[in-house]
């Protein structure tokens, strides 16, 4: 879908620069370019008309098997491998507890105007040539068969860069779009967004040969569970009962919405009421059927589709009531 407006900020200085580590990781491939416009959000248009099953992708662009093994990615906390599909496209495959959460979150983030990479849930398939695997061995059989994987497309037209950003250090500080992202991360209980580790900048070539810097939360796997606070043992991912119990909004006071965000980043729990009202206007356009499609795309069981949809509807209604919209 074409989005007609974007939040674009041009800055002359870079955020801190670093490199990803770990064999096979999605390594920064392109130097940062401070002269290119910075984009965090695009107007999604008629949100109520969006298809949250395919999201930013499309059925025609979905991964197509069989898949051939490239390498194992040892970065992060979840088992991952890199593969090529039948059309020669390169994909990052993730297994285990973040698979469903990441795809569902990807659909919601995209629908509300924030930038994402193409992701798909694949129920089963075969990877040829996968030998001597480490932690991915549990999820890829000796015959190459796998079940329940998240596929993320490595788009050569929008490679990741060395530029880093956090929710406190970025070109969008003070904007309603950044405030909306704070609310959105609390809405889906994303507790692992501290620092630049899960935030990336893509260098994308767009129409007319122009280049833009796309700022996105690149790992959405620590969602739809318990934020918990404190040590990581207090947190969970993709646990419906935990998601149902988490508090969303603390209070409204002196023109500020106080979020009950209890993740690794303690500084995103206060949002100007005007910004919160703007975001509530976006989120309230999502229908129950659209939310269901997002969870179906993530491979959720029927009870999970029902439960997550109902809780999100409840949280969005709570937001609307809190901001008076």
Where are these regions (language model features)?
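N-terminal, Lys/Arg-enriched amphipathic/low-complexity engagement segments
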Residues: 22-67
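Conserved kinase catalytic-core segment
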Residues: 101-102, 107, 160-235
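Conserved ATP-binding subdomain of kinase catalytic cores across diverse folds
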Residues: 56-164
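Bacterial N-terminal signal peptides that target proteins for export
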Residues: 1-8
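Extracytoplasmic/secreted envelope proteins and their assembly/folding machinery
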Residues: 80, 102, 106, 181-184, ...
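C-terminal catalytic region of ATP-dependent kinase domains
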Residues: 207-325
